[in-house]
């Protein structure tokens, strides 16, 4: 039996996240149905992680086992004939039978975009958080340094999740500005439920003067969700890369 690895990208605006849900349209269900039409058998489609409602992905990785003999290089073309315009498969390959798109991942990179100006943008409103109040990007950069390294990030997670450990390692966390767009770029070995969005919301609080950047290490070590910032809205978040 073959293990097929897919790379897809999607605009998450009109989906209730990645994971299949009983009464909602999800990315996983949509891709799974397209795959099954091609291979003509039931498959279990495994994803590299759960993205929430409204969150986007440029390089999402998933895999499935199949007895189909269709050449992997033809799969993207076949799948895209069945997928809607807001989901695209751009790569497929046969991979090792032990490959698991989630547990085999060693790092993930997310980007969060903030439109920081008075008026919203009709094009960017699906892909950024419009925040009209001034933000001090230098303070945000100072605070971002505190996240680097291995920490217990329980204070930067929403409730309603179950994991073996809440310790995660952040390899890099950069904040930069291009015109009216502030970008938060983070790479880690894994992320808790809503962790990146809470980091983004916290850095916005820092940039807006609600949190002192020099207090960030203490806030992380406190493991207190109440001391961190808000959970930033989903549309600004995009999964950029998964590393294996």
Where in this protein do the model-derived segments appear?
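Structured-RNA-binding interfaces characteristic of tRNA pseudouridine synthases
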Residues: 1-244
């Amino acid at each position: 039996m073959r293990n097929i690895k897919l790379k897809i990208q999607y605009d998450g605006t009109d989906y209730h996240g990645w994971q299949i849900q009983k009464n909602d349209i999800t990315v996983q269900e949509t891709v799974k149905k397209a795959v099954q039409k091609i291979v003509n058998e039931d498959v279990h489609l495994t994803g590299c992680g759960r993205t929430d409602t409204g969150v986007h992905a440029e390089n999402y990785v998933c895999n499935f086992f199949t007895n189909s003999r269709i050449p992997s290089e033809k799969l993207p073309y076949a799948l895209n004939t069945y997928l809607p315009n807001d989901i695209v498969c751009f790569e497929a390959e046969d991979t090792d039978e032990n490959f698991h798109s989630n547990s085999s991942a060693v790092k993930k990179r997310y980007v969060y975009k903030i439109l920081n100006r008075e008026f919203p943008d009709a094009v960017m409103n699906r892909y950024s958080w419009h925040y009209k109040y001034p933000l001090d990007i230098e303070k945000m950069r100072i605070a971002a340094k505190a996240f680097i390294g291995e920490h217990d990030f329980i204070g930067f997670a929403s409730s309603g999740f179950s994991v073996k450990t809440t310790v995660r390692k952040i390899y890099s966390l950069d904040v930069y500005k291009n015109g009216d767009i502030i970008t938060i770029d983070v790479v880690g070995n894994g992320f808790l439920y809503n962790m990146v969005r809470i980091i983004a919301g916290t850095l916005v609080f820092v940039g807006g003067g609600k949190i002192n950047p020099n207090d960030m290490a203490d806030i992380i070590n406190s493991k207190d969700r109440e001391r961190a910032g808000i959970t930033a809205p989903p549309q600004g978040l995009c999964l950029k890369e998964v590393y294996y």
